Structures are given as structure tokens and as C-alpha cells.
Amino acid sequence: MASGSRTKHSYHNSSQGQAQSSGTSNMNYKDSISKAIAQYTADARLHAVFEQSGESGKSFDYSQSVKTTTQSVPERQITAYLTKIQRGGHIQPFGCMIAVDEASFRIIAYSENACEMLSLTPQSVPSLDKSEILTVGTDVRTLFTPSSSVLLERAFGAREITLLNPIWIHSKNSGKPFYAILHRVDVGIVIDLEPARTEDPALSIAGAVQSQKLAVRAISHLQSLPGGDIKLLCDTVVESVRELTGYDRVMVYKFHEDEHGEVVAESKRSDLEPYIGLHYPATDIPQASRFLFKQNRVRMIVDCHATPVRVTQDESLMQPLCLVGSTLRAPHGCHAQYMANMGSIASLTLAVIINGNDEEAVGGGRNSMRLWGLVVGHHTSVRSIPFPLRYACEFLMQAFGLQLNMELQLASQLSEKHVLRTQTLLCDMLLRDSPPGIVTQSPSIMDLVKCDGAALYYQRKYYPLGVTPTEAQIKDIVEWLLAYHGDSTGLSTDSLADAGYPGAASLGDAVCGMAVAYITSKDFLFWFRSHTAKEIKWGGAKHHPEDKDDGQRMHPRSSFKAFLEVVKSRSSPWENAEMDAIHSLQLILRDSFKDAEASNSKAIVHALGEMELQGIDELSSVAREMVRLIETATAPIFGVDVNGRINGWNEKVVELTGLSAEEAKGKSLVHDLLYKESQESAEKLLYNALRGVEGKNVEIKLRTFGAEQVEKAVFLVVNACSSRDYTNSIVGVSFVGQDVTGEKIVMDKFIHIQGDYKAIVHSPNPLIPPIFASDENTSCSEWNTAMEKLSGWSREEIVGKMLVGEIFGSCCRLKGPDAMTKFMIVLHNAIGGQDTDKFPFSFFDRNGKYVQALLTANKRVNMEGDTIGAFCFIQIASPELQQALRVQRQQEKKCYSQMKELAYICQEVKSPLNGIRFTNSLLEATNLTEYQKQYLETSAACERQMSKIIRDVDLENIEDGSLTLEKEDFFLGSVIDAVVSQVMLLLREKGVQLIRDIPEEIKTLTVHGDQVRIQQVLADFLLNMVRYAPSPDGWVEIQLRPSMMPISDGATVVHIELRIICPGEGLPPELVQDMFHSSRWVTQEGLGLSMCRKMLKLMNGEIQYIRESERCYFMIILDLPMTRKGPKSVG
């Protein structure tokens, strides 16, 4: 309801609002449904007041009526309101309407102006000639010419009748042409008849195609705009619609989450007052009207002053005829008066539909779409535009909706990234500092969601930020929350007054809205918003002294005034995404505020290991399946490393190119294996894939090798997939292709008119792809044998029909209007000379089988070079390619799942680590023996190592050598103790002895370097050697040989040579291969060793693995500067 407050609670039911779990999307969806239902009640109330206000609504006080819409409305009144809107029984007089029983063609209803428009004789007028009579029961076919009747019969038999609109028919008596626009209703078929402006049907078709071309040009302009700017997109679409239609003013209305509207873009005649920035209450566009816009996406009112024409219908019909889908439906009197008051005589309204929520999409179809807003044209005089141009505008709106949807998704993703980053920084702040830091430092909790102020109430202390209540007021709010919402986990409202807070008046307009998250029973986080009106400004004309009834008349000014009244003492509502962000932070903070126990860390570390091992096994299974598939596939598959050199080359590529896998490996894909004309597109494809942007349906031209392959070329259509390792780092690119060499040769000949045209098109040769052609008016002029086989429709049934709507739409069904819009754009672009290559195109064949293909559309020229239409070629993906893509998606899904799990573990392990650090700090303050201090230092060193590993989980910096080292002074002996402590449990389990051959002076030797990274590297090498030492009764030895080397300025470098030795065979060969040579690791341990080797190299160290007859060992060499004084004490 426009004037209702929005108060949400988590797991709490109160008189002020509905119980709701904040952060639950399904509840958010239900909440939006409840708002819409409440809005229906408000709309019905306004409608009843208007109906009772007398003739023409002169005594109807609009602003006052909006205020009183909270009053309850009887159910019968709502039913009457909806009936009036949907079954009003009147049409606009610029056309006429006939409703027909579908089975018998018998007329069941007609508008009273139909006789005059069709030059017919009314039943009440006696006539001596054989003029046709219009009455209930007349066969509609007798009113039109024989050829028109045939068209109507064909349309009645269509599955999707609206796709054939408009049908060009002629009145039998007068010969006048009409656009017949047909749609099905519950009792039959409604035929809207709009007078056409030309006598020649061919000109009508050409005019419709010209309208589509104009729309395509506007769509191309939209698609060329830079991304990330919704305002620019809206500004462009109003300019395009105004240019197409010629209306004096065109606006974009956006519906906000609370159902109220705003003008966000406008293009107008210079002398008209601006409406940009105008906000209006939700009741200005009733929910019933919004429902109608989803059903009938284009609505034209030609003259708001025109007297509506009554519809006469068969008395046997149970209720008035449904006019929801009619292009002629008369406007409601309330809306007509509003238009007249604002000086707008004619209007055109175009619905902007985008994808809805996941919950909305469960039912599929239209239910998964959401009305985002409207594009509306106003004109100061009577104006009518023909149906083909309106149809073209609908295509433009579908393209606008697609583009807008992508921009909204991008904006949502950017917002989510911002929220996640802010949450991470806030949590990190909590781990390092005291809780008040999330308010006093930057970023603060104000950066999480849009607000005017925020506060933390922690341990009975108040930490405010921005516009907030006083400390006394916040304590009062806390007492109110505990008293009335004590069993809740949070509350959000746009009006504290409506939520029932008794002290709301004392807060004034500064604090109207509040969101609160309960961290503990005594600790709270608050966000505050001021009243909405301070943010709302309209650039329209101010109240004119002569407009004495300005507040009462229905007019944009009174709408704006009513809106300001509705939002008085109210903030902008808290959006679902904002509440999700607050709820997520609340969950994280709850855990962070609890005392962490050391045992927690053990459980989490154990869980991390278990999850990693399980994930590795699952990924290995997928990887083995991929390898088997690649080796046996009949589709060409190959791969390159990060340098673009071949590292995979399956048998199918060998067969096509004549180049063996051994010869191909190591060659540059771009420079050694591709023709020059493919190099630029391949380089771009490779560049993007190595940065995570995968390409699809790119054509490349491969060279061939061997005596029999001279001067031949292989054409492949490839998908480039980024190859990633376990850490999600990109290590190369895989290409899955389809051989289209045969089709390419045919197409080249075809486009250049080489050879026998008919023989090529209709050849049964399997190399000839499915082909269809269009003339300049998008009518099908060719449909070859392969296309007949693919679609199930014969050439005789298809040729001559319109490709957009009639063929692809009615015969070959497409998935939704968006698919038809995209196909129309491709087709018109080709006719206009802009070719499209490998466009994803899917449809249902005659038997309902779903066909997935790639569409290539090229312009079609005659011998003189003039464009006469378009050629379209269909390529079907091979089963092997489809299977490869399915396995790829499975692998990507598994990798993404592992990434989420790893991110979760990295986040959750921070709290127990913080607990370990806190426990260590407490122990330091007690009286400890020297041995206990040494144990404590070792524990602290291991904790710092684990923290750094978790914090720097991105391995890309290690791979490319850009890792930042954090150097400090430290005891070398402390590092050795920490390293040894990490393998002691494994030594005991395996029964392996550790031998330490380390000079005593090492314990007190101080050096300068990255202590934690050195510790991490040495621990990993030692752990792997212990893991593969013979057991039981085996041994592992650590030998450390330091030597001092003086350098300039009197400084000294400690040259360290450390050996980790074990008897027997030592590490498995694949582990050593992973460590030193492979860019694609096979084992989990191999990845760790490879990273440690690269970290050691970053610290100017080196490692060798040496295998002798009876033993093997790591030899690690590292130079570290020696310091003159010891390091600061640990902790």
C-alpha cells in the first residue's frame, strides 16, 4: 500500500509487521507479493471514490483520496474494480472490434462502430440489396473479401496466433484495408481492426519491414553503448522512441521496490515543462494496469477526449468480454482525466520487462518476468501510429529489457563485491582491533549499506557515526527493542513511528528509518536513514497562482504532492540486498564476539584437510574422464600453455592437419599453425581466455602438413576454455572445436555465386548445411533439403511465409520473445549488409525436439551487386562437442564449489587463530620456565605461519614473482624449532626417528629475512620427506651448515646449506616432476612443493633434489644477512 510502513523482523511476529527472516530471498519474494496485494486494495479504494465523485470526476480530490487509501475495502468492491479494468465493455473509436467463436467463426461480440467502419448494414436497418448484416451469429468470413477470409482461416489454425499479427484484410463491401490484430480469450478470438493507410498489401509489408529496420538501427545503437551506465541507456532509449514515433515527450518511468514510480529519463519538446525527477505514489499506475502491461506490452491512447464505443455481445456469455489483450481497449475515466489535466491528448505506453527473481522463475514462462518500468510517449494533440510501427517499438523494448537486465546484473555483482570486500575488511578489523574499530576506523559499517548514520552499542557504550540519535535516545530505543522485540534477531523499518516506537516524534525527520542487527543480547549494530523527502527534488514547474485546485486535480504536481505526503516521516525502504548484507555481517560478528577456543582450530584445520582430499578425489575423477574424452573424441580438441604453445593435441586434430602430437607440442598456435587471416582473432581469443574471459564460436583457419596436405586449410569453429589449476589460477587454454571445412567451402561458393545455385542449395550431400534465405521483406525465399530434414517442415509449407514470427515463432517455436528479437536483429543486419557469424540459435522442430545450432547470416546480392535479401546457414554442434561442453561445465561447477569451500574455511579459521593468539598473549604474562617460553615461541611462530598462508591464499603472486616479502630480524634457531614441531606428530605415527645435526650456535644466530615464509618452505620440504621415509624404524636427518661471508660496509651474510635426508627411494617421481617441471600439477603435495620452490627462489634461494643409491635428500641453499643485535621478543 502506498501509505503503509515497511517493518521487517527476523523470527519475530509483531503487530507492526509480518514475521520475516531478513536475508531470505524467498521471504523477500513473498513480501513483494503481499505489497502488490495491498496495493490492489488501495487502487480499488481510489477507483470507488472516483466513481462516486460525479460526472467527469470534477469533485474528486486526488491528494486527499491517496491519503485515505489505508481504509479497508470490501472484497466485492475489489472484484468490481478488477472487472471494470479488464472487462470494461468499451473500446477507443479509432478502430473497431469483432469477437468470434473459434470453432464456428460465428460472431459473439462486436463494437457498435463496426457497421460504419466496415460499411455494413446494421440488423435494425431493412435493406433490399444483399449487403452483409452485422449481428451476433453472423459468420465473420462473410464480412471480408475471399482472400481475406483465407488469411483469417489460416490464422485461426495457428498455434501462436499473435505471431501472425498484423493480418492485412479488406472489407467486402467497401474494399477498405485494415490491420487485423488477433488474440485468443476465454470464449473465442478477438479481432481488433485498425484502418490501414494504403491499398497495396505489398506496401504494407514493406512498411512493416521498414519499421523493423528502424527499430534494429535503434537497437544497434543501444548495443553499442559502453557498459555500466544505466542512465545513458535510458537517455538513449527515450531519444530513439521519440525519433521513431514522433511524440512530443517520451519518458522512462522506473518502479521502485516499494511500488512508487520515478521519471529517470526524458526527451521532450523544448517548450514543455520537464518531468525528469518526478516521483509519484504507487496508486498513479494501479497494480491492475501493471498486470495488463505484462499481458499487452504496447498500449496506445489516440485521443483521451474521444467518447468510448460500447461493445455489444451475445447474451449467453456469462460475463463481459475480456479486453486485456485488445489494442483498442478504452482508457479508464480516471486515467483519461489525468491525461487531459496535464495537457496530454494522446499517449503510447511500452512495457519494460526484465527477468524476475529466482523464486518468481520457478513457474517459468511469463511468471519469471518482472515489470521494471514503462517507456511512455505523450502528445499534445490527437496522434495514432500504425500497428507495424508499434510492433517495432515492442521489439525495441525487448532489446532494451535485455540490455537493461545485463546492466542491472552487472550493478548487482559490483554491489555484492563491494559488500563482500567491506565485510572482509570489517572482520579483519575485528580480528586485529577492538570491536569499536568498525565504527571509528575506515571503512566503517556506514560503508556497508546506504545510510545517513550508523552506530555500535557495545558493552553498554555508544559509538555513533553520522546522523544518529543521542546516547539517551539510543538507550531508550534499546529498551524498546528488548521489551517489544526481545525474541527477534533484528528489525528494519522505514518509519519508526509506524513501527510503534513511542519516542519517534522526538527524533524528528533526521532519523525516520532504522535497521538493527542483534549481535548478542546486549550488543547491537544500528543503521539510520533520514526522511525521504529531503532526497527528492523535481525540476518541474512550481505551483502557479492561477491553479487554485492544484492539490485536488489529478496532475503530475498533485501526484508529486501526494507522494511527498505518503513518504512524510518515512525514509527510503531498506532493499532486500541491503538487508542480506546486514544479516551476513551479523552472523560473522556473532561468531567473532564469542571467545575462541584452541580446540576449534584443530577441528577446522582437520575439516580443511578432509575437504581438500575429498575435493581432490572428485576433481581427479572428472579430470580422468576429461582426458579419456579428449583422446577418443571425434571432435578436434587441443590446448596451449600460458605462452600460447601447444601442450595438447588429440587424434582428430592429427587426422585433420597431418601433424602428429609430438611434432605439434611446443609450437606456437598463432604463429606456427594458423593462417595469417586467423591470427588476429586467435590472439584476441587467447588473450581474453588467459584472463578468464572465455570465447565461443570463433572461426580459425589451421595449416595442414605432409605431402598430401599441401595448400589445404582446415576451418574450425572453436570454444576457448580457461584451464585452471587447483588454486583456480589460469595455466593455459583448452580449445574444443568443430570441423566446418566442408560447410565453409560450400558457403564461400554460395556467397560469391560460384557454381550452380540450385544444385548447391538442394543437394542431398551431407556436407551441404541447412540453408534458408530471406528476401528484402524478411519473407522466406529458400528452404533447402537439409533445412527440411532439420525442422520437419517442407519447402512448400514454408516458402512465402514471414521468417520472423510466422516461421520462427509459430512453425518452429522459439524460447520466448527475447529469442525472436535477437533473430530479427540478426536477419535485418544481414539484409543491411552486416554479416553475423556463429550466432547461437535454438528452436523446436515440428515434433517438439529442441534443436541447438549456430546461425551464420550473410547478405544476398544479385549479379549487379545489389542486396536482395539474406542467406542463413545453420551449423549443428556435434555430439562430441556437446558432451565435451557438458563435462567442462561439470568441472567448472566442481571448481567453483571448491573455491567457495576454501573461501569459507579461510574466513572461519581466522576466529580460532585469533583465540590462539589471545591465549598466547595471556600465557606470556605468567611466570614461565625457559622451556615453556621456547614452546610458546614455537606455537606463536606456527600461528603466524598459518595466518599468513590463509591471508595470502592467492597463489598468482607467487607464480608471477610479485609476492611481497615481509622481512624482519629473527633467531634462526626459532625457525628450526617451529619447523620441527610441525612434523613431530607424523614422526610418532610412522615410528620414524629425527636426527638433528645442527651446530649449537644456530640457536642464538640472528638473521634478517621473511621468517614466516622461510619457516613455511622448510616445513613443507621436511614434511614431505618424513611422509615418504621408510617406516617403522626409519629415520630422517636434518643437516645444517652455516658459514659467514663478509660483504661491503662491514656487513656479514650467513650462507646456509641445509640438507633433509632419508634412506630408501624417497619421493615418488610424479611428485618431483610436479615440483620442478610441470605447469599442471598432478598431486596435492606436488602443488605445495612447487609453490615452496618458487617462494624460495623469490628469496634468492635454491633447492635441489638428489637421489643416490641408498638415500635421497633435499639440498637447500639460502643467504641471509646477519644482524648485529637480536630480534624483539616474540609476542
From Swiss-Prot:
Disulfide bonds listed in the record: none
Basic residues: compositionally biased ranges: 1-11
Compositionally skewed regions (Low complexity) per UniProt: 14-25
Chain ranges of the GAF domain: 229-408
Annotated stretches, region: Disordered: 1-26
Keywords annotated in UniProt: Chromophore, Photoreceptor protein, Receptor, Repeat, Sensory transduction, Transcription, Transcription regulation
Residues that coordinate or bind phytochromobilin: 334
Domain of life assignment: Eukaryota
Positions of the PAS domain: 622-693, 756-808
Gene Ontology molecular function: phosphorelay sensor kinase activity; photoreceptor activity; protein homodimerization activity
Role according to the record: Regulatory photoreceptor which exists in two forms that are reversibly interconvertible by light: the Pr form that absorbs maximally in the red region of the spectrum and the Pfr form that absorbs maximally in the far-red region. Photoconversion of Pr to Pfr induces an array of morphogenic responses, whereas reconversion of Pfr to Pr cancels the induction of those responses. Pfr controls the expression of a number of nuclear genes including those encoding the small subunit of ribulose-bisphosphate carboxylase, chlorophyll A/B binding protein, protochlorophyllide reductase, rRNA, etc.
Protein name: Phytochrome B1
